[in-house]
């Protein structure tokens, strides 16, 4: 049905399925359904340790800059590769079309979808790890998987292995949104989470499109493989100095 109609279908799903679901099923706080933050029965000490901060105060804390810039470069690398993944698949010669249940599926589209499926799994997987490990560890695993996935899908010309690396790439970037919010939650507490996430966008959003422009320009210059490798190298650099506090006090 073409890319444009596919996006139209996505838009209709958001309007008629996701928005009503959010309206009736998403809660504001765990207490609404008889649960507790971080599964702690005694919330008094937890809540008293979290002071509501002024927006300008976020910029005074080094951990705010570290988390924001680490994920800014992670999104930079992810966006540059993900946007151009179908074109890269075609350049690798993955042009075959399969028929499944009467629907034609191109190899390029399947690989792209497999990366997206990895993204869904990554959200659940890294959310699980974040509850059970020091927050630094899931973030490092996530970014390492994104980097490994990028290097693999760039260098491999076997389609089966290529799709596996696409999935690994998806696992990595899929956990990014979950882990970024979790990192800010660990550092600044639940009372400041909404504000700090919004302020961090001032740093993250301007950086994110750079990867897309860089890789797109590299495609025009027939240097996109080098740009993919650069995206793979940027990802691990972004978490080199990411060290989070072990409690919600900054």
Each language-model region and where it sits:
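Intracellular juxtamembrane helix-capping segments at the cytosolic ends
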Residues: 175-188
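A late C-terminal transmembrane helix in Major Facilitator Superfamily
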Residues: 192-219
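Extracytoplasmic gate region of multi-pass secondary transporters
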Residues: 62-119
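Helix-loop-helix hairpin linking two adjacent transmembrane segments in secondary transporters
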Residues: 1-29
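Interfacial helix-cap and linker-helix signal at transmembrane-aqueous boundaries
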Residues: 1, 89-90, 129-130, 215-222
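Conserved small/polar residues in nucleotide/adenosyl-binding loops
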Residues: 240-246
